């Protein structure tokens, strides 16, 4: 499948087409509540290449199904159903994105402390703790 082939090039795909290539944001659903990010996060969590195909499910009248309608369809067809929020919660519980970067002694007139430096590997934010 060309969409997961590391050697694929833009000219390998017919354009315009019915499957539009999308690029997910680094950090996945923790930085953007998008279907693209959910798709690549699910593939990553499954231990697969972070590439997939996502679609919106349409009703008979051509409009997009909403969450309540999708829940009903999932029940009717015995399908597993999760939301982006469920995926975000799972990732926050099971993955660590704040890493210890440095430790330093901090002697003060009030006593000796240790200072710990951390970095969030998704946002790049730095944090200090005493």
Q: What are these regions, as identified by a protein language model?
A:
Residues 1-130:
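Catalytic domains of riboflavin
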């Amino acid at each position: 499948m060309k969409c997961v082939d590391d050697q694929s090039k833009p000219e390998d795909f017919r354009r315009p087409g019915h499957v539009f290539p999308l690029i997910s944001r680094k950090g996945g659903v923790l930085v953007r509540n998008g279907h693209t990010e959910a798709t690549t996060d699910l593939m990553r969590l499954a231990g697969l290449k972070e590439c997939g195909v996502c679609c919106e499910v349409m009703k008979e009248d051509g409009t997009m199904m909403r969450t309540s309608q999708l829940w009903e369809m999932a029940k009717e067809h015995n399908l597993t159903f999760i939301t982006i929020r469920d995926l975000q919660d799972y990732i926050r519980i099971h993955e660590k994105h704040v890493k210890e970067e440095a430790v330093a002694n901090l002697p003060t007139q009030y006593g000796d402390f240790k200072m710990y430096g951390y970095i969030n590997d998704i946002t790049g934010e730095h944090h200090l703790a005493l």
